[in-house]
Swiss-Prot record:
Keywords: DNA replication, DNA-binding, Endonuclease, Hydrolase, Ligase, Nuclease. Belongs to the inovirus G2P protein family. GO terms for molecular function: DNA binding; DNA ligase (ATP) activity; endonuclease activity. It comes from Salmonella phage IKe. Its EC number is 3.1.21.-, 6.5.1.1. The gene is II. The keyword Zinc does not apply. Transmembrane segments: none annotated. Isoform G2P plays an essential role in viral DNA replication. Binds the origin of replication and cleaves the dsDNA replicative form I (RFI) and becomes covalently bound to it via phosphotyrosine bond, generating the dsDNA replicative form II (RFII). In turn, viral DNA replication initiates at the 3'-OH of the cleavage site. After one round of rolling circle synthesis, protein G2P is linked to the newly synthesized ssDNA and joins the ends of the displaced strand to generate a circular single-stranded molecule ready to be packed into a virion. This is Replication-associated protein G2P. InterPro entries: G2P (IPR006516), G2P_C (IPR022688), G2P_N (IPR022686).
């Protein structure tokens, strides 16, 4: 799936000033004030000065990020005025999957389809600014390609993320400062590629909660449409147990792979790709994750499915705080005790834990249906699984049976002739 796309659309040459600086570097820029006058765009000023006679002087003009509306999500738009070795452009940034279908649990792999949605939304929302742009020379600044491994449930998926926190290989280094409970990242800040693994079901649930917390009157139209899509129980069920592997690819990676920089050249490249258009996205992903997945070979991890135990503890030991929030702290503490019994054995835990705390915790565990005999014989000996078997990214199983590829609402001939570009 193409999970994120950043397009940089240059301005028409008549609006761009070009020169070489004293060191021979190419410098180009566009007059933001003139662009604003022609397009009706609103700019921000770094400095505003008032003279005694009332004259107003504005300097340091810039264009802040703004959002273009679409049916399901916004497109981030920003104008860059240019500089040394950087052409002035309009940058568009969004998840094509969210634009086209309201979610990115799975989604399209066609650059042509994704680009049509970007250009169509841009032309519809800001036709005057669109007319100032040289659309056919659009370049790609970043592509996120994403595929998922499916495990039995979210409990096991959490174990996979925990294991991945200790994995790195070759030029793929873990970014420790950006670890979260359900996310692990490698190579943050790289100009080549950044890799991320995270739990999709957790992200979907967090997005739903975030939208539901807003008053209905404060939701935008596209947020309401998005919430309706995310509330689909089939979609939520499909997201359970999905471990998402996302590669955020930058221009240096494009060069190493042999991918063109210009967007319409990429469209043609994909159309003519030897093994098929879908496989271009697969091959980009495989190349980006090769070092990491090589590190998986020969690695084993303990896999335990204790989701029923955890659910029973949540049901019996959750409480409501004074502020009205639900607290799972006691259930989590008891589950941690249960996991110690699994990993260290009953006798070892009994000998190393404070006696009163041990017996109280044991009594509370047995109150949810576990017998003392069971707790004395927990073992992980039969749960060792090769990591490459656990993390199986099957490219033929990336969509549910009911998936239908979305279609752009925009007419290609009214936006830009992709085939003729």
């Amino acid at each position: 799936m193409i999970d994120m796309l950043v397009l940089r659309i240059p301005f028409k040459s008549s609006l761009v000033s070009e020169r070489l600086d004293s060191k021979g570097n190419y410098v180009s820029h566009v007059n933001l004030a003139e662009v604003a006058r022609l397009s009706g765009l609103t700019l921000a000023a770094h400095t505003v000065e008032y003279a005694i006679d009332g004259d107003l002087t504005v300097s340091g003009l810039k264009h802040p990020y703004e959002s273009l509306p679409s049916h399901y999500a916004g497109i981030a738009l920003k104008i860059f005025e240019g500089g040394k070795n950087f052409e002035p452009c309009v940058e568009l940034k969004a998840s094509p999957a969210k634009l086209l279908q309201g979610h990115n649990v799975f989604g399209p792999t066609s650059f042509e389809l994704c680009g049509l949605e970007f250009f169509g939304a841009f032309a519809a929302a800001m036709p005057e600014l669109y007319d100032l742009c040289d659309v056919t020379n659009t370049v790609v600044g970043r592509i996120d390609v994403t595929f998922s491994a499916k495990v039995a449930n979210d409990h096991i998926a959490n174990q996979v993320i925990s294991f991945l926190r200790n994995v790195s290989n070759g030029q793929t280094k873990k970014t420790r400062a950006l670890d979260y409970e359900t996310t692990v990242m490698w190579n943050e800040g790289s100009r080549h590629r950044t890799l991320v693994a995270y739990l999709k079901h957790h992200e979907v649930q967090a997005q739903i909660k975030r939208l539901q917390k807003k008053k209905s009157s404060h939701l935008t139209i596209y947020e309401k449409n998005c919430l309706e899509v995310l509330s689909n129980p089939d979609l939520q069920l499909y997201a359970v147990g999905l471990v998402r592997f996302e590669a955020r690819l930058h221009t240096r990676f494009f060069e190493n792979f042999g991918l063109p920089r210009k967007f319409f050249d990429i469209v043609k490249y994909q159309d003519n790709y030897e093994s098929g258009s879908f496989n271009l996205i697969c091959d980009l992903w495989k190349k980006s994750f090769k070092d990491l997945f090589d590190a998986f070979k020969g690695s084993d991890m303990n896999v335990y499915d204790d989701s029923k135990v955890y659910d029973a503890l949540i049901n019996n030991f959750s409480s409501v705080t004074k502020s009205g929030n639900i607290s799972n702290s006691k259930a989590n503490r008891l589950f941690g005790f249960y996991r110690r019994l699994v990993n260290e054995g009953y006798d070892n835990v009994a000998q190393t834990m404070e006696r009163t705390t041990f017996w109280r915790s044991l009594k509370e565990l047995t109150s949810v249906g576990l017998s003392k005999a069971q707790l004395m014989n927990l073992s992980t000996d039969n749960n060792v699984v090769p990591l490459v078997q656990m993390i199986n990214v099957d490219f033929s199983q990336q969509y549910p049976e009911w998936y239908v590829e979305p279609v752009s609402i925009f007419n290609r001939s009214n936006v830009v002739s992709i085939n003729a570009a």
